[in-house]
Curated annotation (Swiss-Prot):
Its main location: mitochondrion. It comes from Rattus norvegicus (Rat). This is Cytochrome c oxidase subunit 6A2, mitochondrial. PANTHER family: CYTOCHROME C OXIDASE POLYPEPTIDE VIA, CYTOCHROME C OXIDASE SUBUNIT 6A2, MITOCHONDRIAL. Component of the cytochrome c oxidase, the last enzyme in the mitochondrial electron transport chain which drives oxidative phosphorylation. The respiratory chain contains 3 multisubunit complexes succinate dehydrogenase (complex II, CII), ubiquinol-cytochrome c oxidoreductase (cytochrome b-c1 complex, complex III, CIII) and cytochrome c oxidase (complex IV, CIV), that cooperate to transfer electrons derived from NADH and succinate to molecular oxygen, creating an electrochemical gradient over the inner membrane that drives transmembrane transport and the ATP synthase. Heart/muscle specific isoform. Keywords: Membrane, Mitochondrion, Mitochondrion inner membrane, Oxidoreductase, Transit peptide, Transmembrane, Transmembrane helix. Residues 1-20 are annotated as: Disordered. The keyword Membrane applies. Belongs to the cytochrome c oxidase subunit 6A family. One of its GO terms (biological process) is mitochondrial electron transport, cytochrome c to oxygen. Residues 47-94 are mitochondrial intermembrane. Residues 1-9 form a transit peptide. It is found in: Mitochondrion inner membrane.
Length: 94
């Protein structure tokens, strides 16, 4: 007789499909992951606030403008933030 050369798609047709593993991951989620996210969120909230800008140092290898940008006045980057991003000449005055 000819032997069928195929294998079945499932290795086990009955039984528990990872019940103990699912309980382990559920326990790790509620005991480890969620409190860790809560502590990190609390840490970010407590340290949020206004930060002073560092002193501008005109390094010659940064903020090089070989040609103007094609938007605005040509000196500001596309997502320029005047509170954080300096121009080649220094920070903008508020």
């Amino acid at each position: 007789p000819l032997k069928v050369l195929s294998r079945s798609m499932a290795s086990a047709s009955k039984g528990d499909h990872g019940g103990a593993g699912a309980n382990t991951w559920r326990l790790l989620t509620f005991v480890l992951a969620l409190p860790s996210v809560a502590l990190c969120s609390l840490n970010c909230w407590m340290h949020a606030g206004h930060h002073e800008r560092p002193e501008f140092i005109p390094y010659h290898h940064l903020r090089i403008r070989t040609k103007p940008f094609s938007w605005g006045d040509g000196n500001h980057t596309l997502f320029h933030n005047p509170h954080v991003n300096p121009l080649p000449t220094g920070y903008e005055q508020p």
